[in-house]
């Protein structure tokens, strides 16, 4: 086994591939698409995508407004032309399963995600799984009588719906509901019910060829020290010969490549030898550095 110094040196030489999960001021990001693309270029990437959150049929604080789609796509076309020959630029959408599927049409690629738990007739009352430890504690108590396995079954049942949408090539943050578990353990990932729900969704998604993103967003936000999915889930993905890609779920220029070296090392430790990168038309394998 490599020592700590050897591991650091190894991480330093890991080759950058691309980041397809990044948000801008067109939804809940802090920077313009051009600022994000320039940050990806400075990080050594030869291609990158900016993704806009799909609008939702109820009020919330982070999804894009429907009228933002056209100006976003116009700006992305401008950036594709401006940076041609320097970095390939792609326009993506992070599509929530509660959004209209028609929103998938004009984009180069789509990330399919679940953020909400459907717990009642009022969609605006549906809790978000990644808001805060306090809201997680509240929705578990209020809607699931403290039964975290029931909440996990609800969440993975939602995420499984991504399998039914062929235009969503990537599965976003597979186990997003565990975002806060390093601070306060809300979910028992070793529970038979939790694993059954997670693996049922995983099998459905793998069976239709979805690519699973290994997402470092909670690392940059200070909630986790490792990416989604958890290691046990990554090992299960490897057993199923699933395809994976790495993304930062970045909302600002300083996190576009957060923990990519660490994540590639983790994937190698789980037996992965390649990640899948988008080339503008399809996804192709790239050997992990």
Regions found by a protein language model. Give the residues of each.
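Charged helix-capping and loop-helix junction motifs
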Residues: 189-197, 226-235, 261-262
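Structural recognition of alpha->loop->beta junctions
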Residues: 106-109, 233, 237-244, 261-277
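Extended substrate/RNA-proximal surfaces in nucleic-acid metabolism proteins
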Residues: 62, 67-207
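An N-terminally biased module of ancient metal coordination in phosphate/nucleic-acid-related enzymes
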Residues: 3-97, 178-193, 241, 245, ...
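C-terminal regulatory/interaction regions
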Residues: 270-273, 279-289
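Conserved, mostly hydrophobic/aromatic
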Residues: 21, 40, 110, 173, ...
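His/Asp/Glu-enriched short active-site or ligand-binding loop at hydrolase and phosphoryl-transfer sites
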Residues: 211-222
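Hydrophobic residues within beta-strands of alpha/beta enzymes
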Residues: 48-50, 110, 171, 212, ...
